[in-house]
Amino acid sequence: MPASAPQNSTTFDSARFLDDYKKTADALGAPYNESIVARTLNSFGNCFNEGTVIWRSTSRPNDKLNYRFYLRDRVDTVALAIKAGYIEESHPMARLVTCWSNLFDGETVQWCDLDPEEGVAKTWIFMKTQRSIDNILDAAEVSDCVRAHRATFHSLGLKLVHFAAVDYHGGTLNIYFTVPGPISEAQAAAYTNLSGCKPPTPDEFADLRKYLPTQRFVFAATIDYTTGKIKRVAFYALNVPGSELPETMNDRLRKFFADAPSYDKQQTKNIAWSYGNGDSKYMKGLGEECEESRAGTFGPDVGGCESFLLLLRL
């Protein structure tokens, strides 16, 4: 069932999801463990039923097909992951997530990125509104080597944060900035330089100018928690309409958008260009599996769930 043929139901169905997952992963040549995928659907209470469920794929051959849920209400998903045995309570990334989640009088929401072989890949922290990068870096569990980027972030205009995330298996943290647009070539080059990567090619920059919002856009940095090294950065194009896709997108990611089922009445696509150490580059795509997104779901600063079906795997 192609993504262009939405069905009537926007309610999550675990049996349907598992069947759709296997078909989509097989079509993409993405590895998975069916029993682990099935177990994750039962490990997080009503999170799949109450949230928006997202597919996530990349342009890299044989890369995994991950899946996510975005929630409206506060749920301790870290505790659920620990209870299920996916992570240890003492894991530095688990402590960091809990620390960030307790900022701003607990006015945050945790989201999860699930891995078809490991169980849990990442936990996201949605800040509900834009927060100062200083608040994020000053959190008790943030390592000093990560805080060392403070002046650099400020000098590049990377001052406001709407989301953060941790990667349990990669040992990295992600910070998602909201920055003014429209993007310029100098701005793009300065941002990719953070990860030691060359500037976007002319074709890539043409796509960035075409698809990134002109008023403001999402830019993310992936940082090693132990060393402080910025390993990767990414630019996000949100709510790409209809069948339109960037010229620089390869066949694998195009197939993902064509084949991944969606049961949402209003389908949206979210696309990221990722630039990493050693000039490693790839693209990411996210699409909704179910639950109709509505503007204002997460507040006016975000503009609805669709504004960050992103993010963002950084």
UniProtKB/Swiss-Prot annotation:
Keywords linked to the UniProt accession: Prenyltransferase, Transferase
Class in the EC hierarchy, top level: transferase
Matching InterPro entries: Aro_prenylTrfase, Prenyltransferase_CloQ, PrenylTrfase-like_sf
Keyword Nucleus set for record: no
Gene Ontology molecular function: prenyltransferase activity
Pfam families: PTase_Orf2 (PF11468)
CDD domains: PT-CloQ_NphB
EC numbers for this chain: 2.5.1.-
Function: Prenyltransferase that attaches isoprenoid moieties to carbon atoms of aromatic substrates in an enzyme-catalyzed Friedel-Crafts reaction.
Sequence similarity: Belongs to the aromatic prenyltransferase family.
Additional free-text comment from the UniProt record: The gene is not located within a recognizable secondary metabolic gene cluster.
Name assigned to this protein: Aromatic prenyltransferase
Organism: Arthroderma otae (strain ATCC MYA-4605 / CBS 113480)
Phylogenetic lineage: Eukaryota, Fungi, Dikarya, Ascomycota, Pezizomycotina
